Every structure is written in structure tokens, then in C-alpha cells.
């Protein structure tokens, strides 16, 4: 039943050969990878105003344009840098691969950890922001914000579990719809002003002077418009061939849309003197330009959808990033395994769970989540820019000096943003990210250390392979079958034990002499020459008496012998039946596996369905 439900939810399994059909081109690659960056324009200008308006009043609008121009300049630098990254690192991984290759393993892990945190926050911020936009238009939905967010994350998870191709179709159309709405609003807004419309003005007084630190704070807030630019470089392997060419085309289109949308909205905010308040800035603009007509609701709906879809960029990048890191040994190997629909399903589920935890913990509050946002992605920006600058200096390829200057400038600017965000948003939540990233780096390095240690212990050199003779009897095998009672499962285990060794014993641990005598009498009825050893354990311990017996002279165990412990097991038909039976076998297996001379095997006995047995009993009566 579970499998049928799973198939209905995410579709039938796909073969490995179908992976080529799961890749996307420019038309669908653009919306699925650009939704994060494009959606940022819906709130980036608002984040700048939240810093400037309370401090310098009406002067905020003029400074908003200057700050927007600076952010657009940084966008162009990042675009150039990531084009070079795509050309030089076509296997994906973005900042993680660039930093690892040029700055060393630790720098790469820091970039990977920072980018992972940013992807998780992208889902939490985008979904919360989208719900905030829709509840700004429909206030009666405000009390249900958290539940709506959780439902949306669940839908996103299911959509992405269905595979890359299907998710690109599902989540692609809203991006184009949003871009159309924004362009229409930009044109209509400018035409309306040129036609003589005078927007209402709210008196706003400055309460403090324009300082460099104030402008830097506003700049760092507005840099949220740049989040998502790195997504294309992380997902190059998801493109159809020629993947590099298609990825670069998507990146250029993405940057062009962000430039026009973000720059245009900043101009409209200044023209219409929009304030940052209870209602989202983009909703206020739509209301001012179109009134409460069709286009107002169109902008509201597409803004909500694009903000939600922005998180789909994370669903494209996060699982792939973790898969690459898992392949390198910095994350659990399970994250490098594709699911039934050829998506990295474990990464998708992990992202959904972590994003949901954040949404619930911060009660879907965008302002609180924004405090954590951006610092992670700008750390990865800085490391990526620094890595590319070093690459040009090292390789000295064509135009290397100009490229190094551009990347070096980008590295300095993004590093400044990291410092500003870290300082200005420390109390707002940035401290959490500042702590979490080093913890993640430590965890990833420990994981890598473990995998390397395992590899060293398992490695067999070609020279050793030629000397090993598996045909020889390397071990003398002795078998022990622990039995709790004499039943079909234990008898089946004893029969199997006899087929693999002549040295077999049955072993029972009883809590008192009375129960021990009972099992001895019942075992005596069994037609077998396998001896039964009964040990008493008044403290109800099970494994200790068995291990003590193995090491005793009574057992006559010799160094070099291998002991196979066969555990009888019955397998129930329904999963919930498992909770009705104790897990003694699991505990015994766990403890015995700590000893290198002991092999643990299970002998299963499949039980029939309860209803079938009940019907059989009724017939026999």
C-alpha cells in the first residue's frame, strides 16, 4: 500500500538511462534557476528603505538609487565571475569546487557550509516572504501563516521528488508570469508619471545625518537582490549538452532580468515615494499604479508564487551541492544517491525538514529570518571570487590581469558585505549563522576524516591481491545459536547452523533455574546431537553471559577461530506489528559486532498474515 501511495505521489521509478531526459535547456533552466534571484527584487528595495527611511526621511529615495546602482555594479562583477566559473568548472559545485581547487580543502568546506546554510534560508525566507505578500493583500489569512508555509514546503518537496524535468515544468511558468507583470508595472508606472500623475507624499523628516555606516547597512540589506546568482554555476550538470553554453546563456539572461527589475523597481519606489510599512512595497506599487483592478491582483498573485518558487532554486542547488560534497567525502554518502525519479531525494527531504524547522522556530517572520540571510551566500561569494582571482594569477592565461582585478574587486566588496552584515545584523540573528557555519565545517571535516580512515583500513594493494588465496581454509568456523525458546524459528536456525559447521552449540540465557530446567526438558525432546548450554543471569543481562562463555575454557575457543552467531528471527507481515515485539535480537547483534572475531547472521522465518491464521484455526475447529 505504501509503495502504491508513493508511486501516485512522485511517479514510477526511472532507469539510469532516463537521466538524459531529466535535464533541461535554456527555456526551462532559466525559470527554475533564476526564481531565487528574480524574486529577490520583490523585497530588496524594501529592505533598503527599512534602514534609510526611519533615519534620513525623504532623502532615502535619492540614496536608494545610488545604493541600487552600486548593487547592480556588484551584480555585473559576480556575473562575469560565475561565467568564468562555469567555463572552468563545468561539473558544478560552484564556490565549493572553486575554493577547494584554488584555496585548499578547508576553504572549500567553508564555502560549501556557507552555501548550504544559505540554501536552507532561501527556502525559509522565500516561502515566508511569499506568504507575507499574500497575507498583506488578504489580512484574514495572517493567523494561518505558519501552516500555509509548511503546506507550501511540502508541495515543493513532492514536486521536486518527482524529478528535475517535472519540477522545471511545474515551477517554470510562474517565473515568466512574474517577469511579465514586473515589466508591465515598470512601463505603466513610468507612463503614468510622464502623463502628469503626482503621487501623494508623506512628510518624512531626517532624524540623523547620512553616514557611511548607514549607507553600508542599507547596501548590505539590498544585497539580498544578489542571492541566487550562484545557482547556475552549481547546477551546470543539470543542463542538456552543450551544458556550459546553455548555463552561461541562462546566467546572462538571469542577470539582465535582475538588473532591469531591481533597477526599475528602485526607480518606481523613488518616483512614487513608497514607504516601508505593514504592506509589502511591491504591493503598494501595484496598488498605486493599477489601483485595485486585475493587474493589482495579478502582481499580488505572481509575487506570492515567485517568492514561493524562489525556494525551488535551493531545491535545485542544495541536493546537487551535497551530492558533490558527499562524493568528495565531506557529507554522508547517502546524499550522493539518486532516488526513484533520478533526483537526489535525500537532499530534497533534508532541505525540506531543515527549512520547516526554521519557519516554525521564527514563526514565519521575514524580518527575523532576513537577519540570518545573505551572510552565508556572501561568504561563498567572497571565497569564489578570491579563488578565481588566485587562479588567474597562477595560470596567467589570456587577459589574466584584467580578470584578476575584476575578481579581486568582487572579493573585496563581498567581504565588506560579510563584515557589515555580521556586525549590523548580529543581534538580529546573524550570530546564529556565524556559529552554525564553523560547526558545520567541523562536522564536515570529521566526516571526511572518518571516510579517509575507513578507506585506509579497507584498501588492498595490487601486490597484496596477488598473494591472497581465498580458496584456502583461512579460519576455523564455530557456530553458536542463541535461543530463547524451542520454536520453529530457533529450529530453523539450528538446521542452518549444521550446514555451515560441525562445531555447533545452542545457547540459552535464563533468569532463574526453573526457566532453565524447562528449556532443558523441552530441548531434550529434540532429535539432535547439538549440545545445549544454559547459563543463568539473575540480573537479566543477555550478551554478557554469552561473551563470558566464549572467552572461557569451557568453550575451548582458540585464537584465530571465527565464531558465527546465528540469531533466529521471525518476520511479521505488517510494519506496525514490529512495535509489538521486543528488539532483543537487534541489541545482541549491536553488541556482538564490536568483536572482530565474531560474525553475526540472522535466520529469518516469514510469518503469515494474522487474518489467514485466524481463518485456518476456525476451519480446524
Model-identified regions with their sequence ranges:
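Membrane-interface "cap" regions at the ends of multi-pass membrane proteins
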Residues: 1-55, 80, 91, 99-106, ...
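Cytosolic C-terminal regulatory domains/tails of membrane transporters and channels
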Residues: 1-16, 453, 460-621
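Extracellular loop-to-transmembrane helix junctions
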Residues: 3, 48-100, 105-112, 125-152, ...
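Loop-to-transmembrane helix boundary motifs in multi-pass membrane proteins
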Residues: 105, 145-150, 240-260, 326-360, ...
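Helix-loop-helix junctions that connect adjacent transmembrane segments
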Residues: 176, 181-227, 424, 428, ...
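Hydrophobic alpha-helical segments and their helix-loop junctions in multi-pass secondary transporters
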Residues: 177-203, 265-272, 382-397, 446-455
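Extracellular/periplasmic helix-exit of transmembrane alpha-helices
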Residues: 190-196, 248-284
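C-terminal membrane-solvent junction of multi-pass transporters and transport-like membrane proteins
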Residues: 334-345, 381-426, 457, 466-468
Amino acid at each position: 500500500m505504501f509503495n502504491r501511495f508513493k508511486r501516485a505521489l512522485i511517479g514510477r521509478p526511472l532507469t539510469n538511462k532516463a537521466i538524459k531526459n531529466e535535464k533541461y535547456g535554456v527555456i526551462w533552466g532559466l525559470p527554475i534557476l533564476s526564481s531565487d534571484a528574480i524574486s529577490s527584487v520583490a523585497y530588496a528595495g524594501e529592505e533598503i528603505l527599512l534602514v534609510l527611511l526611519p533615519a534620513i526621511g525623504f532623502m532615502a529615495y535619492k540614496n536608494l538609487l545610488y545604493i541600487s546602482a552600486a548593487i547592480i555594479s556588484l551584480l555585473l562583477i559576480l556575473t562575469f565571475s560565475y561565467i568564468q566559473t562555469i567555463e572552468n568548472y563545468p561539473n558544478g559545485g560552484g564556490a565549493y569546487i572553486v575554493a577547494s581547487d584554488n584555496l585548499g580543502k578547508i576553504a572549500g568546506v567553508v564555502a560549501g557550509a556557507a552555501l548550504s546554510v544559505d540554501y536552507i534560508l532561501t527556502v525559509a525566507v522565500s516561502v515566508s516572504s511569499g506568504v507575507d505578500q499574500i497575507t498583506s493583500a488578504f489580512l484574514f489569512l495572517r493567523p494561518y501563516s505558519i501552516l500555509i508555509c509548511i503546506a507550501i514546503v511540502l508541495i515543493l518537496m513532492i514536486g521536486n521528488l518527482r524529478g528535475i524535468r517535472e519540477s522545471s515544468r511545474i515551477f517554470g511558468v510562474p517565473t515568466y508570469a512574474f517577469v511579465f507583470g514586473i515589466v508591465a508595472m515598470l512601463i505603466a508606472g513610468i507612463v503614468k508619471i510622464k502623463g502628469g500623475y503626482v503621487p501623494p507624499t508623506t512628510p518624512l523628516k531626517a532624524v540623523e545625518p547620512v553616514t557611511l555606516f548607514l549607507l553600508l547597512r542599507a547596501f548590505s540589506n539590498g544585497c539580498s537582490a544578489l542571492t541566487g546568482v550562484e545557482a547556475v554555476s552549481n547546477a551546470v550538470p543539470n543542463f542538456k549538452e552543450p551544458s556550459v553554453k546553455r548555463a552561461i546563456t541562462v546566467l546572462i539572461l538571469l542577470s539582465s532580468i535582475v538588473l532591469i527589475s531591481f533597477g526599475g523597481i528602485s526607480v518606481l519606489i523613488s518616483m512614487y515615494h513608497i514607504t516601508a510599512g505593514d504592506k509589502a512595497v511591491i504591493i503598494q506599487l501595484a496598488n498605486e499604479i493599477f489601483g485595485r483592478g486585475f493587474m493589482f491582483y495579478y502582481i499580488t498573485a505572481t509575487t506570492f508564487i515567485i517568492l514561493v518558487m524562489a525556494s525551488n532554486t535551493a531545491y535545485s542547488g542544495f541536493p546537487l551541492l551535497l551530492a558533490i560534497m558527499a562524493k568528495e567525502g565531506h557529507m554522508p554518502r547517502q546524499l550522493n544517491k539518486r532516488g526513484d525519479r533520478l533526483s537526489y531525494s535525500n537532499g530534497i527531504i533534508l532541505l525540506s525538514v531543515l527549512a520547516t524547522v526554521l519557519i516554525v522556530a521564527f514563526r514565519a517572520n521575514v524580518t527575523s529570518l532576513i537577519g540570518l540571510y545573505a551572510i552565508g551566500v556572501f561568504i561563498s561569494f567572497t571565497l569564489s571570487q578570491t579563488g578565481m582571482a588566485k587562479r588567474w594569477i597562477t595560470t596567467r592565461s589570456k587577459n589574466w590581469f584584467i580578470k584578476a582585478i575584476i575578481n579581486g574587486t568582487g572579493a573585496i566588496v563581498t567581504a565588506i558585505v560579510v563584515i557589515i552584515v555580521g556586525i549590523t545584523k548580529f543581534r538580529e540573528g546573524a550570530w546564529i549563522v556565524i556559529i552554525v557555519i564553523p560547526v558545520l565545517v567541523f562536522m564536515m571535516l570529521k566526516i571526511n576524516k572518518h571516510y579517509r580512515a575507513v578507506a585506509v583500513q579497507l584498501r588492498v594493494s595490487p601486490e597484496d591481491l596477488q598473494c591472497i588465496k581465498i580458496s584456502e581454509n583461512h579460519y576455523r568456523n564455530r557456530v553458536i545459536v542463541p535461543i530463547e525458546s524451542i520454536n520453529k524459528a530457533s529450529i530453523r536456525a539450528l538446521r542452518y547452523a549444521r550446514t555451515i559447521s560441525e562445531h555447533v552449540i545452542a545457547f540459552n540465557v535464563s533468569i532463574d533455574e526453573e526457566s532453565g530446567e524447562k528449556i532443558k526438558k523441552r530441548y531434550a525432546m529434540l532429535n539432535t546431537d547439538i549440545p545445549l548450554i544454559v547459563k543463568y543471569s539473575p540480573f537479566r543481562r543477555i550478551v554478557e553471559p554469552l561473551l563470558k562463555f566464549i572467552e572461557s575454557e569451557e568453550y575451548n575457543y582458540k585464537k584465530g577461530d571465527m565464531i558465527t552467531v546465528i540469531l533466529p528471527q521471525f518476520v511479521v507481515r505488517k510494519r506496525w506489528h514490529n512495535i509489538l515485539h521486543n528488539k532483543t535480537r537487534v541489541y545482541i547483534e549491536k553488541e556482538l559486532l564490536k568483536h572482530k572475531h565474531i560474525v553475526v547472521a540472522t535466520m529469518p522465518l516469514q510469518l503469515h498474515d494474522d487474518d489467514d491464521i485466524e481463518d485456518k484455526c476456525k476451519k480446524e475447529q
